[in-house]
From Swiss-Prot:
Belongs to the BshC family. One of its GO terms (molecular function) is ligase activity. Pfam families: CC_BshC, Rossmann-like_BshC. It comes from the Bacteria. Its EC number is 6.-.-.-. InterPro entries: Bacillithiol_biosynth_BshC, CC_BshC, Rossmann-like_BshC. This is Putative cysteine ligase BshC. The gene is bshC. The keyword Ligase applies. Residues 461-504 form a coiled coil. Keywords: Coiled coil, Ligase.
Amino acid sequence: MPSPTERAAHRTPPAALGAFPDLFVDYCTDFDAVADFYPGDWQSRPARRAAATAAAKRPADREVLADTLLDQNERWGLDERTRSHIETLRDPDSIAVVTGQQVGLFTGPLYTIYKTITTLQLIEEWADQTGRPVVPVFWVEGEDHDFEEIAAAHVLQHNEVVPLSYEPGVDDNPGAVGRLALTDGIQDVVDRLDEALPPSDFKPAVMEQVRAAYQPGTRLEDAFARLMRSLFEDDGLVFMNPDDARLKALTRPLFRRDIEDPRASVAPVNAAGRALRDRGYHAQVNAHPTNLFWLGDDGRWAIDLEDENAFRLRGTDRTFSRSDLLNRLDETPERFSPNVVLRPLMQDHLLPTAAYVAGPGEVSYFAQYGGVYDWAGLDMPLIHPRASVSLVEGKVQKVLDKYGLTVADFRDGLEPLFQDVVVDTMEVDVDALFSEALPQLHQTLNALKPEVEAVDRTLGASTEATRSAIMDEMEALKQKVVRAEKRQQDEVRAQLKKAHTNLRPDGTLQERTINVLYYLNKYSPALLDDLRHALRTDTSAHQVVGV
């Protein structure tokens, strides 16, 4: 395993991987082409200073925010550095670099970790460039109702992807999934994780962290935050759960505006979507009024505008008048939840967000949000792409070196790559070799036969018998060569399959499938610190790191 000083990130253009939307590729590599859709160049120092000035003026109530965050982080393991960061948020000059993710099982795919690392890396950079105190915040998104999306984690075992699924038997619409209390079944999933991870010096500590976080009776959002907190315990990362009555109360003005005029909030989103399509890009969002959900006892339901004064919970017969909905917002704001459009606006209404660290999909979402930020009277933060990373183990690097491959060569799948490598590595074309040799043998025997018959006419039959025997032996030799070639091809296929499974498991980028615990168990929890030193904050390229 490379030492921290030996580890370095090799950069690959995002387009070479064939895994990212064109909009994201241009955002990273040709910002001027998409500048019309965003508040500023994420790498520009003047843009950062302007974003910081706007962000510092924004929070709805810094005191309530800080008090709430202190209470929340106490549940997950509040250390002094995190406490200090939360107290810093009371300072009217302070700003935040924010990221967030759904509460995936065991932290979900690697990209959750890369989002966090990028956020932590940017704190000092933004402080130096803006002269302001900067706080790292992780938004714990537990209000989604798509349980299947967050209920599985994947690790590698013997170069195969092993899925670990938690199936507590919830309804199709369980409400805010983060609120779900873990059942006894979580212990079986943790045990399966234990079985899947190979023995190592680091395994006891890794599994202790997992078992401490994922206990029966614990809310899914709390388990997620506790494990993330233990992985980044020395970094002062502030976790924030928006599913809190105090934070929802602060967000009433934003939600009220959406209820009072829901078409006004969706119009700029859809207009930006049309503009993106006109430029040849994909529109990520097709918004419908409203941008809110109702968190009922029986699930999480989209609130649809039915006519000028009536709203219906999507998929049900339950309706509200506008005044009824506004009264409920005043009385129980915690019953309301933002959709994908209002979620970042709620975040930036509550926090002094100067920069948001986003994945490729989120970067595409934000391209449609400029107008809705204007509608809400908010300044959109700068959008900083998270680090996109492939971790290359030594066994995989050997395969890449042997066949002269890069991570980008795996973009089209295993079979096309296998065919390319076989053509390059096979030294003998068996069919061509024998197709050339057999006519030459026949020609030699044809020339020999009359000479032999001149000595003894009865030897002509012997010549033909010899011809037949030689042809049989040549066929046997050909089959031996074919079998030897197949063994070589099978070896090539096995080696490429190993590399493909590690780099593009199930055909997707490693960072979108594999869980970080596989690597921490094998290479030490210190790998996270190593990555912070190896990865660059210029995330315009995919970064390949040897482990």
